[in-house]
């Protein structure tokens, strides 16, 4: 879950003003929620643009959470718009309508969610809190609530360790992290959000989400840290850093990393021990044991290396390009 902290005078705290998703509050026990977070090398506005824009998923996230063959025109419309944000509706919905219609809410200034109900599966939300840290940096809090029609998916999700789920989340985030980091510098040179209509070409109904976000920014909110320049562009290696942007702050992932590093010497010991057994040619049973132990130890070392990399740094090579 999320813990909200009021930094002002206690008497001024108003729980009714918390940025919450009503559907999750109405019947919280009916939801299975996967949570993650990460510090991202981009402004909160850039993150919100990205997660609001549904049309990029089949292309940018091909082979992670999207497929190019599912791409289709997005006939979306804004259904409500005021100083508190906006709502939108996409009748066909993702995957060429296979998942049903999708509604979107932007709860200004930092919260958005997509909401759909897939026939035969259940209700699915994608919830994002984009929290500004400093110019060019924000913290993402992402929630993935599911309301299943069957108990089986809920059970299967519960069996998966949280740190493995977080590794999967990293892969999706890194699909577009590099060019989003570069993109906001291009927009900054063009004049930022006030110049977005001249800088961006947004002629289709797929663009209504991003256009509405910038209308809200220019009419009500303004960009965080307005007037401050973006920091220098980071290297790809820095952009792929998972350890400092997530793992060091995550109890599940940091504990898993400690266990993985502690297990590696034991796997090496088994591998060397099996080599000794293989060197004893006289006893065939020992040779068989040595071969099995060596194979299992080598596989374990390979998997430990993969998990450690998954918790510390991304490859920098998006699955769509492989």
Predicted regions and their residues:
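C-terminal catalytic domain of Rieske-type non-heme iron oxygenases
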Residues: 4, 11-322
């Amino acid at each position: 879950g999320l813990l909200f902290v009021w930094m002002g005078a206690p008497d001024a705290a108003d729980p009714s003003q918390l940025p919450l998703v009503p559907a999750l509050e109405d019947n919280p026990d009916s939801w299975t929620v996967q949570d993650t977070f990460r510090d991202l090398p981009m402004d909160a506005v850039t993150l919100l643009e990205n997660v609001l824009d549904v049309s990029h998923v089949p292309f940018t996230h091909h082979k992670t959470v999207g497929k190019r063959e599912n791409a289709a025109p997005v006939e979306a419309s804004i259904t409500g718009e005021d100083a508190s944000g906006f709502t939108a509706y996409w009748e066909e919905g993702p995957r060429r309508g296979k998942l049903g219609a999708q509604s979107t809410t932007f709860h200004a200034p930092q919260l958005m969610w997509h909401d759909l109900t897939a026939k035969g599966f259940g209700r699915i939300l994608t919830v994002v809190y984009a929290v500004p840290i400093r110019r060019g940096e924000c913290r993402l809090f992402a929630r993935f609530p599911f309301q299943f029609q069957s108990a089986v998916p809920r059970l299967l999700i519960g069996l998966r360790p949280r740190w493995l789920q977080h590794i999967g989340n990293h892969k999706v985030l890194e699909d577009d992290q590099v060019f989003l980091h570069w993109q906001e510098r291009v927009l900054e040179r063009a004049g930022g959000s006030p110049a977005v209509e001249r800088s961006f070409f947004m002629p289709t109904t797929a663009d209504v989400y991003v256009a509405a976000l910038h209308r809200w920014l220019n009419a009500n909110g303004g960009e965080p840290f307005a007037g401050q320049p973006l920091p220098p562009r980071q290297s790809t290696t820095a952009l792929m850093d998972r350890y400092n942007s997530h793992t060091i702050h995550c109890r599940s992932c940091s504990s898993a990393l400690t266990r993985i590093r502690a297990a590696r010497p034991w796997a090496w010991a088994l591998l060397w021990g099996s080599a000794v057994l293989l060197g004893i040619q006289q006893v065939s049973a020992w040779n068989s044991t040595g071969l099995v132990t060596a194979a299992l130890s080598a596989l374990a070392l390979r998997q430990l290396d993969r998990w450690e990399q998954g918790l510390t740094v991304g490859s920098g090579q998006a699955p769509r390009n492989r």
